[in-house]
């Protein structure tokens, strides 16, 4: 009998900045898969998804975020080329200037009409859902 496998739990944080839903923080990944991404990462053992979201946001952008609400869960088995993940996506707000840290090679604030490419994972779909008001 084969051993059961389970998806890894991750979190992604859509960080609104400058008091606007039109401006968000994105990171350029330092490691594969390459591209721009919504800040986020794996939930560590003993940590809630909310704690993981706040930790990952700070680790990658240096920003202290205020979580506003849970947005959606994205769990397509093909969403991450490294393996099956399920991501709890949050909407958060922050003040200040983001600074790239940890596994982020670069961090920038983008207006919804000027998003970079390529985007990693399924983050283009997540942002499309967010900006279209898919709640």
Predicted regions located by residue number:
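Active-site-adjacent beta-strand/loop module that shapes the phosphate/pyrophosphate-binding cleft
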Residues: 17, 74-98, 130, 134
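A short coil-to-beta-strand element that immediately follows conserved catalytic motifs
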Residues: 63-72
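Residue-level preference for beta-strand/loop junctions
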Residues: 5-7, 34, 84-86
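NUDIX/MutT-family hydrolases
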Residues: 89-91, 99-132
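Conserved N-terminal beta-strand and adjoining loop/helix that marks the start
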Residues: 1-24, 91
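Structural detector for helix-capping/boundary residues
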Residues: 41, 55-56, 68, 110-113
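Hydrophobic pocket-lining residues within nucleotide cofactor-binding pockets
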Residues: 31, 43, 74, 94, ...
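Conserved Nudix-box catalytic region and its N-terminal flanking loop in Nudix hydrolases
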Residues: 21-60
């Amino acid at each position: 009998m084969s051993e059961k496998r389970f998806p890894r739990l991750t979190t992604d944080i859509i960080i609104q900045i400058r008091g606007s839903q039109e401006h968000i923080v994105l990171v350029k990944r330092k490691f594969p898969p390459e591209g721009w991404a919504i800040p986020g990462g794996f939930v560590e053992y003993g940590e809630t998804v909310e704690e993981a979201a706040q930790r990952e946001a700070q680790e990658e952008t240096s920003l202290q975020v205020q979580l506003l609400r849970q947005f959606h869960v994205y769990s397509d088995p093909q969403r991450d080329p490294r393996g099956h993940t399920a991501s709890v996506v949050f909407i958060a707000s922050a003040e200040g200037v983001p600074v790239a840290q940890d596994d982020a090679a670069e961090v920038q604030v983008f207006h919804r009409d000027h998003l970079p490419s390529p985007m990693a994972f399924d983050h283009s779909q997540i942002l499309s859902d967010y900006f279209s008001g898919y709640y």
